[in-house]
């Protein structure tokens, strides 16, 4: 992390993973523990939503954010359109159990594993990294891309072979047996991606994304960063963090818009009607139907949450990018605190 030439910087607990920036073993432990928290939240919140779900009311008008996703995946949808929450309970329980396994892994890396993988033996040593080592950072990036590609292919497998997805056009759960593979169709969505209106194109797009992610993962594992990349990019903990935050911000803004207007990936039956864009102190997405006071559709909750989280991630990206380039924010504080010359 940026220390401004001070080798003895001490980070408090609130600095998060900055405390472990130079301890690759502890860094992995922190990431596994973070994954445990995410999975625990998903499981616990799924069970919480089940506890107040009312099958007599539209799902999109019950302040739900996780059950609509599960329903969109074709889970819990009976032949007559009724919702069976038993699969949701099973999924929530599996997430809770998985979070315990991940938490145990995090504790192992923190308490029993080597603090620095440089001292590890066996395959673990391969994942030691230094922030100034582009080759090793590329290898770690490659493994991340492989996992993301696997996630894309899991959705494809669910759509094509394991029960299918919910199709809002027919209001049924069906297998997607002929996903779109025409590159002209897939890449034709570049300027209007949120207008996609059929499952075949969505699943075909995930096939393309999965192939690109896996190919990119293999490339980065085998091929070190090229010279042009080394010249253009900064390789440091602060810079890598800024790149990650920028990517998450972009994904958040895209997800917010997609959720707000698309009714194929986000069916009206589960998320409520499309939203309007409003402008107050800040931009926001507003419901287009009348609801009781302080009630919002699932679409409104998700779109606005993604938008505002993306906004703050963008601020984090800019903050850490400037620090990575050497800008010292303490200078701003000093200038503001000094009295103006008479």
Curated annotation (Swiss-Prot):
Induction, per UniProt: By iron stress.
UniProt KW keywords: Chlorophyll, Chromophore, Membrane, Photosynthesis, Photosystem I, Stress response, Thylakoid, Transmembrane, Transmembrane helix
GO term, biological process aspect, one: photosynthetic electron transport chain
GO molecular function terms attached to this record: chlorophyll binding
Note describing how the cofactor binds: Chlorophyll a.
Protease among keywords: no
Location within or outside the cell: Cellular thylakoid membrane
Principal location listed in the UniProt entry: membrane
Membrane topology: Multi-pass membrane protein
InterPro entries per UniProt: PS_antenna-like (IPR000932), PS_II_antenna-like_sf (IPR036001)
Pfam assignment, any one: PSII
Transmembrane segments: 27-47, 63-83, 88-108, 202-222, 239-259, 302-322
Complexes and interactors: Under iron-starvation forms a complex with PSI trimers, where the trimer is surrounded by a ring composed of 18 IsiA subunits.
Name of the protein in its database record: Iron stress-induced chlorophyll-binding protein
Organism: Picosynechococcus sp. (strain ATCC 27264 / PCC 7002 / PR-6) (Agmenellum quadruplicatum)
């Amino acid at each position: 992390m940026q220390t401004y030439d001070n080798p003895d910087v001490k980070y408090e607990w609130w600095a998060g993973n900055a405390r472990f920036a130079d301890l690759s073993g502890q860094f992995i432990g922190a990431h596994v523990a973070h994954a445990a928290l995410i999975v625990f939240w998903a499981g616990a919140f799924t069970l919480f939503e089940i506890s107040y779900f009312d099958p007599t009311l539209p799902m999109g008008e019950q302040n739900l954010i996780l059950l609509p996703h599960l329903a969109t995946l074709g889970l819990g949808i009976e032949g007559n359109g009724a919702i069976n929450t038993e699969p949701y309970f099973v999924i929530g329980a599996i997430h809770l159990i998985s979070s315990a396994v991940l938490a145990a892994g995090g504790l192992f890396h923190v308490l029993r594993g080597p603090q620095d993988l440089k001292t590890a033996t066996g395959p673990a040593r391969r994942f030691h990294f230094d922030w100034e080592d582009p080759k090793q950072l590329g290898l770690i990036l490659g493994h991340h891309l492989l996992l993301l590609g696997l996630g894309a292919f899991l959705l494809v497998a669910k759509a094509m072979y394991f029960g299918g997805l919910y199709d809002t056009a027919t209001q049924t759960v069906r297998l997607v047996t002929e996903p779109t593979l025409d590159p002209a169709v897939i890449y034709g969505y570049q300027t209007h991606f949120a207008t996609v209106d059929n499952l075949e194109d969505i699943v075909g797009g995930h096939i393309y994304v999965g192939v690109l992610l896996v190919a990119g993962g293999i490339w980065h594992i085998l091929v070190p960063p090229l010279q042009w990349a080394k010249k253009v990019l900064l390789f440091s903990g602060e810079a890598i963090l800024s790149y990650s935050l920028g990517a998450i911000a972009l994904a958040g803004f895209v997800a917010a818009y997609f959720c707000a207007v698309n009714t194929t990936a986000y069916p009206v039956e589960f998320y409520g009607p499309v939203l309007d864009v409003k402008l107050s102190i800040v931009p926001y997405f507003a419901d287009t139907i009348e609801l009781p006071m302080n009630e919002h559709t699932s679409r409104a909750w998700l779109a606005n949450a993604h938008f505002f989280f993306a906004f703050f991630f963008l601020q984090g990206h800019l903050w850490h990018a400037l620090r990575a380039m050497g800008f010292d924010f303490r200078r701003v504080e000093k200038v503001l605190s000094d009295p103006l010359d008479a």
